[in-house]
Amino acid sequence: MFTLADHTFSSRLLTGTGKFTNSHTMLASIVASESQIVTLAMKRIDLKLGQDDILTPLLAQGLTLLPNTSGARNAKEAIFAAELARDLLDTHWLKLEIHPDPKYLMPDPIETLLAAEKLCQMGFKVLPYVHADPVLCRRLEEVGCAAVMPLASPIGSNQGLATEAFLKIIIEQAKVPVIVDAGLGAPSQACRAMEMGADAVLVNTAIASSRSPIIMAKCFADAVKAGREAYLAGLGQVQPHASHTSPLTGFLQQMPAENTNTVEPL
């Protein structure tokens, strides 16, 4: 079981709602992923109606919505989006995203920390999307964030675990859940993140952009489960040298000396 912001979930795979070709494929993929938490960009909600037809099927599945502030360029804009999400969706949960660079979508660490501290004071359950920076993640934890979401590689890139060395440090030090976010492009990469000890992963593009999103969602679900079980089982230690699994040493030492001579060539 996975505990996040005082809620318990059976799935450790979070999914997104963007980039799918249609809403039917999106919903079927989410169901196949067994995910219980889905992210939702505020820009996808109709401000006049207060809702969008994307919400109805998601809520009907009993999913926990995690609105994000994607598109915010600074702390002020992110806080505005957070208040809007709280009013429209009646939730204090928030994925905090601040990326002023539209090309690479790198999160702004300074604005993110400023916004996170203020939002935590306002009662939000903040899950910040950040660089895989152990120092920043610790600071975010100190200001009250419910979890940290360090990136594996640039968002939407499918490049995989480019920040693995730093993710390991964050996982080792964190006292809040670590959700590896952004850039995971294959089920094997999600499995590896879980093997490292991540509490959960968030996947969107790798599922939505695949040839068969519904099947791919199921693959990610299975990979996350396998990775978590492998972590709990304890991976074998990597050795710098070879090691026999079934050495013959003891058996050969018991053989009579005359039987150990070199065989004569024919």
Curated annotation (Swiss-Prot):
HAMAP family: ThiG. It comes from Shewanella denitrificans (strain OS217 / ATCC BAA-1090 / DSM 15013). It is found in: Cytoplasm. Its EC number is 2.8.1.10. This is Thiazole synthase. GO terms for cellular component: cytoplasm. 1-deoxy-D-xylulose 5-phosphate binds at residues 156, 182-183, 204-205. The active site is at residue 95. Keywords: Cytoplasm, Schiff base, Thiamine biosynthesis, Transferase.
